[in-house]
Amino acid sequence: MLKKIETGLQDCYIVKPSVFGDDRGYFSPFFIEEDMDKNGLLFDGVIQCNRSKSAKGVVRGLHFQKNPKCQTKLVEVIQGAAIDVVVDIRYGSPTFGKHVAVLLKPYDSKDEESGRQLYVPRGFAHGFVSLEDNTIFQYLIDNDYAPDMEGGILWNDPDLGIDWDGMFHKYGIDKPLTSEKDGKHLTLKKSPKYFEY
């Protein structure tokens, strides 16, 4: 029912749900626990389904929750478009400190890159840049939100090699819109060892 695609990061995958369409539209089961389990995309029970709305140029991240409230996420864009960025911050992982940037946008039968989800396991930092006004993210999480367990890595940490400037230029973003809070996160090198592989 779903297609699992390697991202180059250990344990992090692009997910393509099945889509059944005709001239009236389409139906897509965007989460089936049994299919996820069969593909090794494990959730410790879905606790919440969240949505966020962002203007063009908004950058959020790079966020995670610390143990024991760390979260697995299944992320998709249901309106607009965004580039989703994930960083492996698990010490000892073969892809520690590496990142992937994935274009996410709603399903369009004429666009092979559309309708993708991103499976973000525990031990990864997550963020994105919104490419259009009124971009809406939807994501499932397997642990509840815990403000005192919030963590983050500086979104533009130079050691991570994320080509934010290239993204901004390609999509006509003159100046990213970021929060003061996200600008205060430490770089990965200066951060505590939150996760072990």
Indicate residue ranges for each PLM-predicted region.
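Short strand-turn motif at the edge of the Rossmann-like AdoMet-binding core
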Residues: 141
